Amino acid sequence: LEDLEFALNRGAEIYAEICGFATTNDAYHPIAPAPDGSGAARAIEAALCDGGISPDQIGFINAHAASTPAGDVAEAEAIRLVFGERSGEIPVTSVKGAIGHCMGASGALETVTSVLAMMEQRIPPTRNYRNPDPAIGLDVVHDEPREASFTHLTKHSFGLGGQNACLVIGEAPANRRTSID
């Protein structure tokens, strides 16, 4: 990671740009998120605002989705609060089903996965997603990767004690790679 200006000046090969970032803490409960998703929604909204990106520009969501009933439903509520009617149309995935919950490393691994998905315009599936919860009501990519066309995504990390973080990632402004070496 480096400042975009420095990367451009040195002619670096740029894979993506972190357009916005925000953290919040809803302090709802030591281990459970606010069930209405309000704390997570504030993080997503603040990250979009930080990046000057409209919710309408988001074409993919890499969810925290740790497969906890309370956490997943709260995250779905947060997505509905921020994206409104579009929330059921934006492809959502989580790589935890494929790689497990890597705790402190999860955010970094999921960010790399998000960047690769954007570069390839191909969203990885949520592995081992067998019994959809009707309370989620989102367009969860499962079974097979999905071809997609998007320029911006959100990457969510929501943790114990109501810690909420969101990255807004956009296509590289210059030197965009077209495939992975």
What are these regions (language model features)?
Residues S54-G59, S87-E89:
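Short acidic capping loops at alpha-helix termini that bridge into adjacent secondary structure
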